[in-house]
Amino acid sequence: MFNTGQSCDAPTRMLIESNCYDEALEIAKNAAENISVGDPQTDGTHIGPLFDKIQFDRVQKMIQVGLEEGATLLT
């Protein structure tokens, strides 16, 4: 068995052709806004919480670096 059903999905970038940029951005934004975080064993939950404070801090740092480098936080 490769894993126990767990995976880390934290892409750091998306490469999008300019002719479909606005549409792709809207699709990504809507998908993120509709993710349900909670108890993974509860129906309707898409992902569980971050594993621990170390992971939480790592994600917060990645967001901060992105903003400092000119990214826009959509949701």
Q: What are these model-predicted stretches?
A:
Residues 1-75:
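ALDH superfamily catalytic-core signature
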